[in-house]
Amino acid sequence: MSSTPAAASATPSHGALPAYDTPLGITNPPIDELLARTSSKYALVIYAAKRARQINDYYNQLGDGILEYVGPLVEPGLQEKPLSIALREIHSDLLEHTEGE
């Protein structure tokens, strides 16, 4: 008797792809296009993390009535994370960045 793995039986036999939404910020914008805007993957990580922190600080200061930081430069999606917003801003060339700062 041979047995088939459970994962194989869960795969649709008609070749249809699984139904799920592609998460934004992880695969969209594409990593290759983001890397073209910086000198290395490490520079991209620092660049995006700094901008995400600024966006997060902007949201946190809204309740205090202080407007020290610049908010999102792209229309944020419902429940979109600051890092995803930062990656979309970088992809859209809305930010200027000097490496080493």
Swiss-Prot record:
Residues 1-22 are annotated as: Disordered. The RNAP catalytic core consists of 2 alpha, 1 beta, 1 beta' and 1 omega subunit. When a sigma factor is associated with the core the holoenzyme is formed, which can initiate transcription. Keywords: DNA-directed RNA polymerase, Nucleotidyltransferase, Transcription, Transferase. GO terms for cellular component: DNA-directed RNA polymerase complex. Belongs to the RNA polymerase subunit omega family. Residues 1-13 have a biased composition (Low complexity). GO terms for biological process: DNA-templated transcription. Its EC number is 2.7.7.6. Promotes RNA polymerase assembly. Latches the N- and C-terminal regions of the beta' subunit thereby facilitating its interaction with the beta and alpha subunits. The gene is rpoZ. This is DNA-directed RNA polymerase subunit omega. It comes from the Bacteria. It catalyses: RNA(n) + a ribonucleoside 5'-triphosphate = RNA(n+1) + diphosphate. Gene3D superfamilies: 3.90.940.10. SMART domains: RNA_pol_Rpb6 (SM01409). One of its GO terms (molecular function) is DNA-directed RNA polymerase activity. The keyword Transcription applies. The keyword Transmembrane does not apply.
